């Protein structure tokens, strides 16, 4: 367990370098009901990915499961968090095995997911404040850097391990970039989406919209995303963005993260199954498909989340 504090050097009168905290004794922790809710969310995400989101190369463009795992490590007690990690490790192994991945590679991928989640959780606990309010602009930027750096390091280690197992690859950079974006976007979007209902539930009701307006905006976003990625016309994709901005103004950060997460999964699933403008443009190029889906996901995040953070700071 990472849990240390900085002390003042009496001879020099200054603090030494920071140290990471995965757990703080003063931090409030959640119990079994929260663990069960997060575990059900983790299983649901894994099942959705397995059933709907794998492309022709058996890969995915966006992996939000690790974000749920990070949220659990930040919310649960050390003992419950360890049990949660072990349970998710088992689910991940089964997921990879069902996906026709041999046991050695399944262990590598699942272990890297665990390491990524633990590292990202420790960095988030250390640098994003005790309240873990990732809806605030400054903490959101900090967390975005944490997600990007953690995923980039995990992708690099993963490519090295795959090189040792399978031999040198002819496309290491694109494989590393896809891995980094897949897990980085998963952390960036899914971690706040999983944290907000437990840490800042009020952020689901802070905007000026009526109670019925919020789920209605989510339903419109889902419908537009399905329509945009069910047909081969790129212009329809642009219709999603104004609704996400409207959600930021009328529904608040909680609904924004839920909308971005839902939009991302729908876009990934339909593209992976050969539907929509991205699949039409690159029907046999999985890296290109994945990168364009990742670009769309990043665009939806950049369109709505900073606006919600700015409005939250103003309010």
Language model features by range: what are they?
Residues 4-9, 13-61, 68-168, 191-262, ...:
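Short helix-perturbing small/polar motifs within transmembrane alpha-helices
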């Amino acid at each position: 367990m990472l849990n240390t504090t900085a002390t003042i050097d009496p001879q020099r009168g200054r603090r030494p370098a920071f140290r990471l905290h995965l757990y703080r004794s003063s931090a409030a922790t959640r119990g079994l009901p929260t663990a069960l809710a997060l575990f059900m969310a983790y299983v649901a995400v894994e099942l959705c990915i397995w059933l709907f989101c794998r492309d022709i190369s058996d890969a995915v463009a966006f992996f939000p499961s690790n974000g749920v795992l990070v949220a659990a490590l930040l919310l649960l007690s050390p003992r419950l968090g360890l049990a949660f990690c072990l349970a998710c490790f088992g689910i991940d192994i089964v997921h990879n095995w069902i996906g026709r991945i041999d046991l050695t590679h399944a262990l590598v991928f699942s272990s890297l997911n665990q390491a990524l989640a633990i590292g990202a959780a420790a960095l988030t606990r250390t640098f994003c404040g005790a309240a873990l309010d990732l809806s605030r602009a400054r903490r959101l930027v900090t967390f975005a850097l944490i997600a990007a750096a953690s995923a980039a390091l995990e992708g690099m280690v993963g490519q090295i391990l795959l090189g040792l197992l399978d031999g040198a690859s002819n496309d290491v950079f694109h494989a590393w970039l896809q891995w980094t974006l897949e897990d980085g976007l998963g952390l960036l979007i899914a971690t706040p989406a999983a944290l907000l209902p437990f840490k800042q539930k009020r952020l689901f009701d802070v905007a000026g919209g009526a109670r019925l307006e919020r789920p209605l905006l989510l339903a419109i976003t889902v419908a537009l995303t399905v329509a945009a990625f069910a047909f081969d016309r790129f212009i329809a994709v642009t219709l999603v963005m104004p609704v996400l901005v409207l959600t930021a103004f009328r529904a608040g950060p909680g609904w924004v993260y839920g909308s971005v997460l839902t939009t991302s999964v729908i876009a990934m699933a339909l593209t992976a199954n050969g539907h929509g403008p991205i699949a039409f443009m690159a029907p046999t190029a999985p890296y290109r498909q994945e990168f364009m889906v990742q670009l769309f996901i990043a665009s939806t995040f950049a369109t709505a989340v900073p606006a919600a953070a700015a409005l939250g700071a103003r309010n």
